[in-house]
């Protein structure tokens, strides 16, 4: 229930990958919770027949239980039903399910019934877009202005003594590559390198290749000051984001492509001692007002840099120093 309270919606397969030994066992348990009103389920109907996989959200009883645990006023039955209706018809629902699927692919390595993990690692922080924005968006950037960083998610992957923190940008192919690339401007203006690497999960290898080539043109040789890695979701083994599916961006779009595991990407961000998590997959999450974390968000003089392409109002040609 806590995962649904935090991440709003998960599919049958995603829930099964986290806690159950089989999809069938998950379906039986979910059906029982749905009958009790703890969970709510819905599906998409396809134009030419058939339906989507079941999507689950908190039912009214589940919402009341979460409210009681948090010592807050529970929603009314009408208000909760309206929320579920909005969720079911959310224009970005496919995107949200994709983001949650990415993190579930990592969190599944901690499934106690999984015996073929091989010690790949575990997810120790999983923040959704809302929580990430609350923490990162409103803080000052490197130039003293507001840093408009709004990742689709933020996480920490730990394996073999390494802790790779990351911001996730999840691409469904609906945005132009220029819009996607422009997001790097916000990360460049923020203290991104103090908190993690920047991951782009592209929906196809062809789009990944075009995106990487576009970065060379858009950045114009400028170092954004951010470690960037990309992957494509149609690659072999891409259903496991912890696997050898990541390629670091080096400023060039040619040469052999080397795929790395998530654990072998550069480590960025603070080391946080594990603690009793407020939410699942939060052992290494930042604590409010943490004295070791807050100084990382303090404004500092921006180091001199060459103009980047995003400095131009048109976003096409970078300004040049006199």
Task: Label every PLM stretch briefly.
Residues 1-87, 294-322:
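Nuclease-adjacent, charged terminal/linker segments that flank catalytic cores
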Residues 76-108:
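Leucine-rich, amphipathic alpha-helical/linker segments
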Residues 89-96, 104, 115-166, 172-179:
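Active-site metal-binding core of divalent-cation-utilizing nuclease and nuclease-like domains
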Residues 41, 110-118:
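Short secondary-structure capping/junction motifs at helix and strand boundaries
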Residues 5, 16-19, 23, 88-92, ...:
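Short, charged/polar micro-motifs that form catalytic or ligand-binding hotspots
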Residues 174, 178, 182, 191-322:
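Non-catalytic C-terminal interaction segments of nucleic acid-processing enzymes
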């Amino acid at each position: 229930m806590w995962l649904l309270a935090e991440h709003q919606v998960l599919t049958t397969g995603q829930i099964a990958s986290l806690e159950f030994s089989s999809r069938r066992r998950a379906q039986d348990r979910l059906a029982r919770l749905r009958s009790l009103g703890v969970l709510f389920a819905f599906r998409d109907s396809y134009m030419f027949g058939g339906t989507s996989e079941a999507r689950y959200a908190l039912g009214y009883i589940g919402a009341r239980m979460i409210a009681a645990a948090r010592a807050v006023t529970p929603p009314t039955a009408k208000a909760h039903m309206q929320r579920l209706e909005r969720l079911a018809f959310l224009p970005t629902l496919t995107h949200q399910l994709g983001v949650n699927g990415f993190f579930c692919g990592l969190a599944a390595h901690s499934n106690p019934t999984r015996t073929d993990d091989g010690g790949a690692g575990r997810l120790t922080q999983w923040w959704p877009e809302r929580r990430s924005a609350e923490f990162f968006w409103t803080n000052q950037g490197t130039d003293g202005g507001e840093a408009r960083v709004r990742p689709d998610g933020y996480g920490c992957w730990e394996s073999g003594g390494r802790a790779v923190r990351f911001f996730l940008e999840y691409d469904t192919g609906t945005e132009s590559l220029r819009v996607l690339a422009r997001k790097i401007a916000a990360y460049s203006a923020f203290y991104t390198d103090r908190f993690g690497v920047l991951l782009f999960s592209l929906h196809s290898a062809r789009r990944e290749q075009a995106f990487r080539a576009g970065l060379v043109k858009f950045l114009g040789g400028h170092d954004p000051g951010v470690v960037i890695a990309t992957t494509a979701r149609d690659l072999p083994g891409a259903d496991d984001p912890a696997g050898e599916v990541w390629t670091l961006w080096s400023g060039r779009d040619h040469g052999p492509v080397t795929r790395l595991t998530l654990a072998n990407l550069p480590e960025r961000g603070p080391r946080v001692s594990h603690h009793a998590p407020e939410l699942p997959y939060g052992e290494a999450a930042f604590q409010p007002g943490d004295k070791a974390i807050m100084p990382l968000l303090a404004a500092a003089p921006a180091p001199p840099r060459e103009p980047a392409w995003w400095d131009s109002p048109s976003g096409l040609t970078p300004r040049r120093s006199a």
